Amino acid sequence: MSKIQTLRGMNDISPQEAKEWSYLEQKLKTIAKSYGYDEIRFPLVEKTELYTRSNEAADIVTKEMYTFQDKGGESISLRPEGTAGCVRAAIDNDLLRTDKPRLWYLGPMFRYERPQKGRSRQFHQFSAEVFGLRSPEIDAELILMSSRFWKELGISNNIKLELNNLGDEKTRKSYSKALVEFLNNQNEDLDKDTQRKLIENPLRILDSKSSAILKLLENAPSIEDFIDEDSKEYQERLLEILDKSNLKFEVNPRLVRGLDYYNQTVFEWKTELLGSQDTILGGGRYDKLVEELGGKACPAIGFSIGLERLILLLKEQSLIKHEDKLDIYFICFTERSLEEAIMYSEKLKDELPYIVIKINLGLESANSQFKKADKSGAKMALILGEEELESKKISFKDLRTKSDQESLTFENLIKKLKT
């Protein structure tokens, strides 16, 4: 019988890799919490309407969503991104009526796209969202928090910040019209996908990955020439705060985000070490989305980090870490000693709840078990053989210092472990 393999673009995370993921996720969670952000969790599956209403023309909705009918005949989709679901959850749970929540979440997203390095059909994001605040100061807080991630992970020198301001609705309409007029004169040089975007959402053309289109856009009008005064002052204040924080950045007037709901501030952190999949974090303001999804008008801003890409970047610089926190490796030689090891292990956890213990259940040779104990990274080995069982003691060996074995009563072992 043939074996069943994982679906294309869906990847397993091995136990060793999971340690690296846990290390990274813990770093991100700790920093988000240090800024006063609270965790929120919401479903992987939502009504398709949630995404079509918020991103009608985005490629994610038109080309990449996993959409199907449930047994009740309702159209549902695996979440392709987290912001719409987070907004829906905030509205549903009445989080926005009296509070201005600052939230974080992480988990898998799903897009049916061509798998490649740094891009999978199931991928993972760590995200932060802020509701009820519209100010350069909160935009700066999110950007500075993301900068702190890189400092903590040791990658600040290989990642750069780009920002733009998309202005108000009038700005975007005026600029879109000018962009369409410019590109219509280049129509023979436009591929089918660009021609489609020219009709549906011209600003999305700025996010093209085609070198030919990017070359054309070098002579296109700039949104800076259409920006409204309020947005201009808003951006100046934001840049002033970032300057005072000694944060390096580049204003990129071609920067847009891949989703349709963004306005005003947008930003990305990019690296040159991962080829075409260069964006590690992307975010921006979405001040109309809450209202579009059925809530009362509420400004908002957020960002998402692609965890697969971030792990690739850390590995590229040999910075990925994990903590093999194994304290005790139990070595046993008989079924009776296995039974005693299990009992001792439970007693140890009663006294030291956070101690990490692994029992070798294979009844292998002493040489084999000691090799596995060394390889496990454990700090110490506890040995139970017939001699130990008869004397009601446990043999203790420090695997770090390689000192001689000691024979200890359980009470003395506890004292030693607590010192």
Specify the residue positions occupied by each region the protein language model found.
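TRNA-recognition modules of translation machinery and tRNA-sensing kinases, especially anticodon-binding
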Residues: 1-419
